[in-house]
Amino acid sequence: MVKTKIPAKLENLESMLQFIRNGAEQQGFSGKEINKIQVAAEEALVNVISYAYPDDGGDVEIRCNAKGAEGLVIEIIDWGIPFDPLSLSEPDIEAPPEEREVGGLGIHIMRNIMDEVSYKREGDRNILTLVKR
């Protein structure tokens, strides 16, 4: 397992995604699959950057664990306000955009790209886990 801890700021997003790209390459995913993994991870990371620390900044820790047949396990950890993104209802993607509720589309994208998406609150940490096989 490799991990990095970076200030949760938009200007660090590219280096966060590169870290995840490196983990996916190590697991042997194709370029197309890596791009999809990065889209899912970007949705999660932008949520952390935008909402985890409303008053002042904080860090995000990213762990990538290449597990062979079990796939790539990405953990996105923050110490921000407790929030389970999976508790949001699925968006009605069939509805016209002007009739859709705000929010939830990023989680929908993550769930459709990744094989598993899970959340847990552990002590003072939010842990979002993304798995791709």
Question: Where do the model's predicted regions map?
Answer:
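Conserved polar catalytic motif of the HATPase_c/GHKL fold
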Residues: 42-47, 112
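Conserved short strand/loop->alpha-helix "switch" segment adjacent to the catalytic nucleotide/phosphoryl-transfer site
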Residues: 20-42, 99-101
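Short helix-loop "hinge" at the ATP-lid/N-box region of the Bergerat-fold HATPase_c
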Residues: 48-52
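Glycine-rich/acidic phosphate-handling loop/turn and adjacent ATP-lid/helix
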Residues: 74-101
